[in-house]
Amino acid sequence: IEQLKTMGCNAYRASHNPPTPELLDACDRLGMVVIDETRRMASDEAAMAELEALVRRDRNRPSVIAWSLGNEEQAIQGTATGARIARTMKRRVNALDPTRPTMAALDQNFGDGVSRVVDILGFNYRTPQMEAYHARVPTQPILGSETGSTVSTRGEYVRDDARHIVPAYDTEHPWWASTAEEWWTIAAERPYIAGGFIWTGFDYRGEPTPFNRWPSVASYFGAMDSCGFPKDNYWYYRAICSRTGTGPAGKGRRSPSGSTPMWTGSSCS
C-alpha cells in the first residue's frame, strides 16, 4: 500500500474477493480508500452469507467507501435475472450499512440488467464507451473499475518471444485493454468519470498474458513487478497522479537496429 501511494494511488479495489484484514489495516492507517468486493454475484444462501459477513466485518472501516457486488458476470449481468440478484444483494447491503453505495464492475451490457440497479457503475476496459453512457444516464456515477493492462517486463525494451519478454514501454496490451496513456487521456478530460483502477498495481501469479504457456507463470500487467520494483508505467502514473515531476528514462538492451527509444514520464504540460 505504501508503494501504491508513492506511485500516486489514492484508492484500492479488492478483486475479486474480500481483502485480508491486514490489508485493510494498512489502508486505514495510510489513508488509502477501498472498494470492498464480494466473491460472486449471487443470491443463494451461501453467497448472501458471504456478502453479509463481508459487510459486517468491514462496515466500521474508515477506508471502505463502497461495496462491489461482483465482477464481469457475463452470463447474468445484462439480464432481468441479474438485475433481480443485484437488487436482493443491494437490499441486504443497505440493511447492514445504509451509508455506503453499491457498485458492480462490468465489461459489457452497460444500461441493462445489473447496471440499472447499482449506485455506481464500473467500466472494465470499455473506457471509450463511458461518454455515450453518461449522456444517456447523466445522474449515475461512473468510474473505470479496471483500466490499462499494458503488459511489460521490468528493465527490458526489446520484445523476445523465445525468452517470454515484452518491452517495458507503454505499448503492448491484450485486445480488450489499452495503454495507460490511452485510458488516462479519456478519463482526465471528463470530470464526470471518477477516476480509474488500473489492472494491476503489481504482477501476480497466473494469467501470463501474452504468452500463456510455460515457463511463464505470472502476469505481466503490473505497474510494479511481484517484488514491488517499479516498471516504466509506474513513473507515468507517478508523474500524472503525484505531480512529482519526471521519472527516469528507460534503459535496456539495444534493438537489432542498434538504437533503443528512450521514454520519460513528466507532469509538465
Model-assigned labels for residue ranges:
Residues I1-S269:
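Extended substrate-binding grooves/exosites of carbohydrate-active enzymes
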